[in-house]
Amino acid sequence: ETIASLDVDLLTKHINQLLDGEEIDVPSYNFITGKREYHGHKLKIGQKDVLVMEGIHGLNGTLTNEIPEDAKYRIYVSALNQINLDEHNRIPSSDGRLLRRIVRDAMTRGNDARETISRWDSVRKGEEDNIFPYQEYADVMFNSSLIYELAVLKQYVEPLLLGVSKDSPEYVEAKRLLKFLDYFVGIGNDNVPTNSLLREFIGGGCFHV
């Protein structure tokens, strides 16, 4: 969650190479082994192409201070839930983000729900330290929350939450989330477009990640 864990020098080098029309060998990070890997994925952009870079440190000037300002356009993306259970009880945006993360971590990082829940306080602190202070530097803000996402996530996250042992400290939070999900009727993912933002978490997307 900290920018110190990133290879900023390599990132800067690659971005400048792309902006100069050169081809780069794109590395990927294996969250299970904790190592950088190369799988032959090459990238080159044309003169009129747009390079999209996504990440929690995207608004932090330290990440791109070697990139020309006129080559950057900053977008702040956040899942801000607009749904209320009733006139007095709103659905916290943080619950939606946690459910997203539980599903994604299970599918791509080899973490079970208990482990993701146990790290959630640290993630929230990381948001306070590394994301929220830089919101004001964004050129535009985009709300990534989808009206149907909790109904779709339900089928993925319920089995994961049910797998949290009663003996673990995370059991109480798992039960709270399960009770919260009872308010939603689950739906399948057949009608979720392959280019939907939700595909980042449930898989089946059309973009290379």
Go through the PLM ranges and name each one.
Residues 1-34, 50:
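Conserved nucleotide-sensing/catalytic segment adjacent to the nucleotide-binding pocket
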Residues 8, 40-45:
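Glycine-rich phosphate/ribose-binding loops and adjacent secondary-structure elements
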Residues 31-39, 122-125:
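Short gly/ser/thr-rich secondary-structure transition/capping motifs
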Residues 33, 43-44, 133:
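Extended, charge-rich C-terminal regions with high alpha-helical propensity
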Residues 45-47, 69-70:
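Short loop/turn elements that form and flank the Walker-type P-loop nucleotide-binding site
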Residues 50-54, 75-76:
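Structural recognition of the conserved hydrophobic beta-strand(s) that form the central parallel beta-sheet
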Residues 56-59:
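Short beta->alpha connector loops
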Residues 61-209:
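Conserved NTP phosphate-binding and transfer environment spanning the P-loop NTPase/kinase superfamily
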